[in-house]
Structures are given as structure tokens and as C-alpha cells.
Amino acid sequence: MIYSAIAGLLLTLTSVATASALPEVNSLESRQAPSVSTISFSEPILSPNVILTFPNGTWVENLVPRSEDGNFVATLLSAPEVYLLSSTNAFPPLLLAQFPAKTSVLGVVELGHDVFYAVVGNFSVKTFASTPGSYGIFKIDLNGHAVGANKPGHGKLSKLTAKGVVVTKVADLPDAGLPNGLTVLNPNTGILLVADSAKGLVWSVNVFTGKTAIAINDPSMAPNATLSGGLGLGINGLSFDSGYLYYDNSNTVTFYRIAVNSTTGRATGPAQALADQEFANIFPDDFTLDFAGGIWFACEYGHIAYLAGVSTGKFQPGIVAVAGNTTGPVGLTSAKFGTTAEDLKRGSLYVSTNGGPFTYGGAHPAQGQLVRYDTALLGFY
């Protein structure tokens, strides 16, 4: 997801992030989480394992595990491209899809066996400007996929290109300002929910019929550009789980959940604030849920932050930074848990990065990465 430009508020990293004690969380093995008080940037609890580094100027925006093999489908914000990334670096990035008339690909999800849906449109990583009305939802079907010859991806990415991938537009979003995060609401009826960061609302998209509608328009989702150097970026990441839609707001630095109808996506209750401006030194972008009901945030300043028991009824407020320092990866954009047997043993959380968003407006933009954090060290898995 796109990070809110907070240059007007925070230009430097602080040296220490203060965190409350971790609540006890039951993992798959009924282990309990240790207590953590103060997190030092120079001594992070979790160390990054860099799996892949892209060329300079490559903003990796979002990723989702591929159920077929445990690798990852990843999107680029800096180019209209979608790649298959090896979770073990067993093969170079495999170009799955290109959209020549567009500039960027944002959220991506898997719906159906080896079928993915992505938000595609025009967004500038240099100016942070979106082109309203340029977006659509595209289907990327990998069921016929095979590795092809070595062909160029874009100017700086010469990579293997997939054969047999079928790409189809399934819906236009002519009234969207900046469709960003994406989640599956109802796999049976083909309903996706899309966060519109510019308009501060959620769209529903039926990928079978192409029908779109505003599902939720709640004040908690609204952007507030005055809080972040002029860039209006409200609701950002979102995820549906067990009757609730979870989402963060980049401008207001908040995290919410709201009860929704699992057929229409419309709200059936008020928004509930789960974290209100508790991200002062870390600023979350996208997030993911774990098997124990916790939320894991990928944060712009290089942190992995954790909020325990959110979807289990055992929620206790308090954000804890469990990874991040001044020399580790920055510009974390998305986080997803791995699905292979080895990933489950390690509690492997895979994170995409842009390397630092403010560099993309200059002559020497940063380089995105795929990074793995093994959370089993914390006792959560």
C-alpha cells in the first residue's frame, strides 16, 4: 500500500520506540508471548532476512502468497507490472503481467485456484499524484502458466517472462480517486472490497459481473492532507475476517474495525478504533492477520509492529514494535505470512519494501526488496 508522505511532520527517525507489554497470545502450539517493554532501534528483536533486492527505482507495493507453491505474487507501484517472487530465491523474479497503458499496480489478492486480481491504474511515485478514473480491476490467471524465455520486464528488470498467463480486465473504477488496498469479501460470489485512499471510502467489486458500488463511506476512512505534508491518504490497508473489516488510516495514524455484511460489504455497525495515533514513531502501511488473531503491520520507517488478540475477542490495546532499526530495511509496504511447511515452523512473515518513498522524487531512487522476518522467535507461532 502507499505510504502517506509525512515529510511535513517527521523527517528523521527517533532513536527509541516505547511499547507497552505484550499481552499473552495463544499460538498454534499454545505458547505464550514474552513481555517486551522498550524496543531499541539498535537492538531489534527480529532480524531481517533479505530474500531479493530489486534494481534502484523499483517500488514493490503489495504481495500475496500463491497457494499453488508458497511463492509470492507481487505488484510494483513504480511500473505497471506483476511478478512471481520465489520465497527462497530459487529463481529470479518472473514477470507475470504488464499493463502498457498504465503506470502502477497496487493491491493484489488470490481468489480461486491460481487466479489473482489486482488494482491497476496511474499513480506517480515521483509526485505522489494519482489520476482519478484511470483505475480498474484486472484478473491474472496462472492456471496455464509455464516459465518462458528470458525477456525484458522494463528498463531495469530483465527477467524470465511467464507463458500461459491470461490477463483480463474485469471491472472499471471510473469514480475512484486512488483505489489501493484490496481484500476478498466473499469468494463464492466473487466480491472484493477496495480501499479508496483519496476519497476515504470502500468500493465493492463483483469480479464475475463487473458491477461496482460504494460499500462503506465512514468518517474514520477520510483523508486529512493537512496532517501529512499535503498528501490526502485516508484508508490504506484493509482485510476482511470473521464478519469484520479491518483497516488503517494513514493520515490520521489510526486502526479500526467495522462489522460488515459478508454478502454486500456494507457496514452493519459503527467503526471501532483499535489503535488511535499510537504509531507515532513507526507509521504503518499495510498489515496482515495471523492465526492467533493478531495484526502485524508493515511500517514505513522499517518496523514490524504487532497488535495482539484483535480478532479473537481477547484484544488488549497497545502497539508493540518487534523489529526495526536505523540500518535495516525501510519503506515497508506490505506483509503476508508464508504458507510452506518451513514457513509455518519459522512463523515467516514476508514483507515488501520500496526502500524509502521520498527518494523516488530525486535522481537516485531507492530499491525495493522482499524480506523475511521469522516471528517464531517471539513465541507467537
Model-derived segments and their meaning:
Residues 1-32:
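Fungal secretory targeting signals
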Residues 86-91, 141-146, 161-163, 206-210, ...:
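Short loop/turn segments that connect beta-strands within beta-propeller blades
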Residues 336-381:
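Blade-level signature of beta-propeller repeat domains, shared across WD40, Kelch, NHL, RCC1
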Residues 77, 120-123, 142, 187, ...:
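Short loop/turn segments immediately following the C-termini of beta-strands
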Residues 32-58, 163-167:
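A short helix->beta-strand "capping" segment at the edge of beta-propeller domains
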Residues 77-78, 125-135, 197-198, 250-253, ...:
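Short, solvent-exposed loop/turn segments at conserved positions within beta-propeller repeat blades
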Residues 53-69, 99-125, 163-191, 199, ...:
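Beta-rich, blade/repeat-based domains predominating
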Residues 45-48, 125, 130-188, 201:
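Asp-box/WD-like beta-propeller blade repeats and closely related beta-sheet repeat scaffolds
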